[in-house]
Amino acid sequence: MNGYVFVTPCHGLTPCLLPPKQNALLFSEVACMQDELSARTEGKRLDTIPFAIGFLSVFAFIVSAIAFPEPFIRFMDLLQDKIVKDLGWASVFFSFLVMLFTFGIVCSPIGSIRIGGRDAKPDFSFFRWFAISLCSGIGIGILFWGIGEPIYHLMQPPQNLGIAPKSHEAALFAISQSAMHWSIAQYCIYAICGVAFALMAFNEHLPLSIISGLDLVMPRKHYSLAKNIVHAACLFSICCTVISSIGALIMMISSCVAYLTGLERSFAMNAIVALVATAFFVGSSTTGLKRGMNFLAAQNTRMFFIILFYIFLFGPTLFILNMGTEAFGYMLTNFIRNSTLVSTEFMSDRWADSWIIVYMGAFFAYGPPIGLYLARLGKGRTVRQFLLMNVFAPSMFVYLWINTFGSLAIYYQWKNLVDVWSFVQTQGLESTVIGILQRFPFSMALIVFFVIVTMISFVTLVDPMTSVLATISTKGISAEEEAPKFLKVLWGGNMGGVALAV
């Protein structure tokens, strides 16, 4: 056409014709972009510097904990107490800002941007997407704290609200606050990180990285230094956080196994549980997102709903419905106030330090790695769909779960059928959950089913973290590629072994 060039730009913009005089400049720019993209997406290989620093830092941290346990524990307690007291308000305040920011994006034109470009097609169905999103962030905590946390809030509500323990308002606060802790703020933090990584990876065609996009605004030498520091810090923080979670999860699962088998819980039992669990989550991670995690998350989600339906059907159904309806209204009425609860009037009251501040701090720590994992699921979806699926869908499930199990615990406590509060204080969460499930028909089958769900939930929590650690340790990896299997085995085996030792 007389030297004109027909061009279709990236990101779904309108095709256009360029005159001959701009041809040379156009092709020169395209060639530069291709060279730059090739440099960014060069073959996958170990990112040696951050990997070595992160791995050795974790090793030194764990050795210190084992060699000097008492000074180490004192130091960590002092550090945590200092952070909670001085910066707790910040974690609560900024989590609230993240929620507002998320709601704003959902309602703005930005929500119409399609991840991967206008013609991108999704890799997962809505159900599979929901299942992976739910299971990668929920872990097994809600299985036990769904009963435990509402009882704590029922018996020990925050002093600055003036709520009487065991009262009707305390029950409404217990259900609504527990649901808030496990839902909206958590998923907003994960989703905002995830959508940012997804746009960088699928729309800007950058490698999947915690600091994607900084290479566009920073000099190369500064970017390399920043990348190494940030990636090493992420590897260290993620690994240590997951190790502590794995240790707690092993103890919970061991308690359930001890009950089912009648055996006394011991180090040998913990070792067997750790070995089996590690083998499962490493195996799932090495098979990749579209196989292992895709399958396990779908089955786990179905099993979640089976348990919910069973408890709802054979439990105090009408009480659960009434409490859920009233608590939902209470949550909406007091959403802003209860999203920003900190101890002001009663400085001696450690309620906020023990609950909302700890939760928000943990969510910010888990935000980037879980967001990095969720980003891989977003191709072909709009930003609005991404946020709705990763925030509102799992939050609705969490409310159903917390209301069902929390209302059950409150009902038993009020009717003196089971002293749930005393059970939690003396026997622990695991025994409390089992004790409550014993009151249902076919209790042994229900408990076995619950333990299986607990194990799968454990796998679906640690699988994404293992994959993220391997991804951060790899150079030039895109959102549609899997990290090398040897890195997944190395990080997964290391975390499982160290968690058992600690």
Predicted regions located by residue number:
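Helix-loop-helix connectors at the membrane interface of multi-pass transporters/channels
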Residues: C32-R45, S209-Y223, L249-V273, R302-I307, ...
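Hydrophobic alpha-helical segments and their helix-loop junctions in multi-pass secondary transporters
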Residues: S57-F72, S95-S112, S245-S255, I272, ...
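N-terminal alpha-helical transmembrane segments of multi-pass membrane transport
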Residues: F27, C32-H168, L313
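Hydrophobic, membrane-embedded alpha-helices of multi-pass small-molecule transporters
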Residues: S95-V98, F127-E149, S183-F202, L235-I246, ...
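Flexible loop linkers connecting adjacent transmembrane helices
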Residues: Q34-T41, R74-Q80, C107-F126, I151-S176, ...
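Membrane-water interface regions at transmembrane-helix termini and the short interhelical loops
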Residues: E36-G43, P69-I83, T102-D123, F173-H181, ...
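Loop-to-transmembrane helix boundary motifs in multi-pass membrane proteins
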Residues: G43-V58, P219-N228, L263-V282, T286, ...
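Extracellular/periplasmic helix-exit of transmembrane alpha-helices
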Residues: W145-Q159, L199, F312-N334, S395-Q427
